[in-house]
Structure formats: C-alpha cells, structure tokens
Amino acid sequence: MDLYQQGLQPLLFSALKADPETVHRQLMRTCAWLDRNVDQGLAQGLQRRLASSLQVEDPRLSQSLWGLSFANPIGLAAGFDKDGVATNIWPRFGFGFAEVGTVTFHAQPGNPQPRLFRLPEDQAALNRMGFNNQGAAAMAKVIAASLDRQARSYPLGINLGKSKVTPLEQAVADYVGSFQLLKTYGDYFVVNVSSPNTPGLRSLQAVEQLAPILAGLQAENTEGKPLLVKIAPDLEWKDIAAIVDLAQVHQLAGIIATNTTIRRDLKTERIAATGNVPSEEAGGISGAPVRSRSTDVIRFIHKQTQGQLPIIGVGGIFTAEDAWEKLCAGASLLQVYTGWVYEGPWMVRRILEGLLVKMQEEGIQQLSEIVGQK
C-alpha cells in the first residue's frame, strides 16, 4: 500500500463522491499543462520529479518490435488520453509506450453523462463514453505542436474509431480519413472495431465488414506504419480465428487483445451513482473481470499464429503476476488503464520491478524470452 492507495484513492472514490469523469478531466488538464509548458521551470521540475520517482530503466526489459524501440513492455491503453494532449508526459510515469484516442474523423461529444462508473467491489469500471473526442484534425494539430516543443522519446500509438454520424456502409472512408490526417504523427495505428459503446461498431469485426477497412487503410499506408486491430473478449473462438486469418492476409502488425466486455459476471449488486443493477446499465466492463478471458484470448491467438503475430495484451493487469501471466500466454507488450486508476501512479514501477525479480528467480536474461512460454 502506498500514499495513493491509503489516502488519495479512497478520497477520490468515496469520500468526495467525485464523478470519475470529472476527476479524469482534471487530471488530463494537469498533464496537458505539463506537456505545453515543458520550457517552464515549474513544469520541468515536476516532470523530473515524476521520472525519478516512477521510471525503471533496465535493458533487460527492453525490446525492438516493428522497428520501434520499447524501453519496457507496459503501455498506457487507449481511452485515457483521448485527444493526445499529453503525449510527452506518459514516459515520465514509467510507461514504455502509450496509445492515444480513440479518435474519430468527426469530432463528437460521446454519449450522455453519467457514462463512467467505478465498481470497486470488482476492481472494475463500467464505461459507455462513446468515443468522445475533438476529431482527427484537432488531434493532428495537438500532436504536431507537442513535437515542435519536444522530440518524442518513446513509441506512440493512435487508436482509430468510426464516427457515430457515419453510416456503417461508409466506415472505410471514415477510418481512412482519420488515418490520412494522422499517419505522420503515430508510430503505430490501431483499428478499433470492438467498443460496445458506438451503435453497430462491433458488427465491423465480422470478416466481410472488416476486410475492406483493413484493405483501405493499408492502401493508404504507403510508409508501412504498423497497423493493428483491437478485438472484443466476447467473440467466439471461430470468429477470433477468422480475424487472425484476415490480419495475416492484410499483413497487419499485430492484434490487441482485448477491449471491454459486455458480460456482467460481477459482485457489484448496484451501481452507487445510479442505483441500478449492472445488467441495467449499458457499456463495457474493464479491469479485473476481464483478466482471465483476455489472457485466454492472447493464448489462443499466439497458438493460432505459432507466435508469428505480435499481441498487445490488455485487461485486468494490476500486478507483476498479472503481467507475467499475459506475457507467458503470448503477449509481447501490455497495456493498462483501469488497474492504473485503482493502483495509482506507482503501479507501473511496481510491475516492472516485480518482473525483474521474477526474471532473476527464473534465470531469464531478457523479458522477451518468456513470451508465449506457458
């Protein structure tokens, strides 16, 4: 237990009765200020303090993937920095990479509030945000300005979604339009067709719907940027296998497994903010309830591809043990979001230090050696 878990987290979660989205918005304003004011003494001092407290630098954690250098395997998942306003800050928190978005071609407000709920009894969150963001053109300007201020020191992914106003039959143009605006600014790109919070979006996981999207993006991808697809944990095995086959046909760089689940296997009986039972609330569940299924999906994909298609594992990672399990199942990289909210800013450091201890115990020289070994 650290200061965050003992003091700040209980205060934010219960005592202040703070709306989770309001807290998140305030945090992002602070991070955006740090990013914009990198030349100011106060911001510089805070960045140095964050880095010295939260970063772990050890070559045994590093790897090269898709021609990119990852200092460590822990990344910030999409959904946290939706508009890319703090891209220079995330390494200071210890992350080896980060993924911004989900961003859509058209700016959109997302779904009505309240739309984000904590489920502490389950170490989970329920969200139905609906891809609220300022749009791809706005993100391009923000990231360009950030790069003018400071060279990027780590890989940045950009997660692309479909605009709500765009009909499903025009999805290809919507995704390609966002990619055209942003392809200069991302080190890798993710096709998000698995959020449960945009009507009809998950239907784009069907091979006949997904194939033209991937083909359109790859036709525009003249620089060969790594392109991945993010899938839902609720798919049947045959559907996952079909997506894996399609990914290989279209020469995707990898798969992100997994997004949030629409299943409601929870301890939480009623959501405090609404008084409703979880089954009455729309949205996806993230955090601990997704842990086991996401690991199973990772293991399935790794076996299906004989380890030839890199996987970014996400879902229910709170500890070094959780991270180790997903790496052994076949994930080359990992992402966190809900666990970071519950465990606090020291979580990444604790996970990395725990992985190094485990490597020492197992006689492992390089962390990448354990990928897919169990």
Swiss-Prot record:
Disulfide bonds: none annotated. One of its GO terms (cellular component) is cytoplasm. Monomer. It catalyses: (S)-dihydroorotate + a quinone = orotate + a quinol. Signal peptide: none annotated. It is a peripheral membrane protein. Pathway: Pyrimidine metabolism; UMP biosynthesis via de novo pathway; orotate from (S)-dihydroorotate (quinone route): step 1/1. The gene is pyrD. FMN binds at residues 78-82, 102, 159, 192, 230, 258, 287, 316, 337-338. It is found in: Cell membrane. Its cofactor is FMN. It comes from Acaryochloris marina (strain MBIC 11017). The active site is at 195 (nucleophile). Binds 1 FMN per subunit. One of its GO terms (molecular function) is dihydroorotate dehydrogenase (quinone) activity. Belongs to the dihydroorotate dehydrogenase family. Type 2 subfamily. Keywords: Cell membrane, Flavoprotein, FMN, Membrane, Oxidoreductase, Pyrimidine biosynthesis. HAMAP family: DHO_dh_type2. InterPro entries: Aldolase_TIM, DHO_dehydrogenase, Dihydroorotate_DH_2, Dihydroorotate_DH_cat, Dihydroorotate_DH_CS. Catalyzes the conversion of dihydroorotate to orotate with quinone as electron acceptor. This is Dihydroorotate dehydrogenase (quinone). It is an enzyme of class 1 (oxidoreductase). Substrate binds at residues 82, 127-131, 192, 197, 259-260. GO terms for biological process: 'de novo' pyrimidine nucleobase biosynthetic process; 'de novo' UMP biosynthetic process. It comes from the Bacteria. Its EC number is 1.3.5.2.
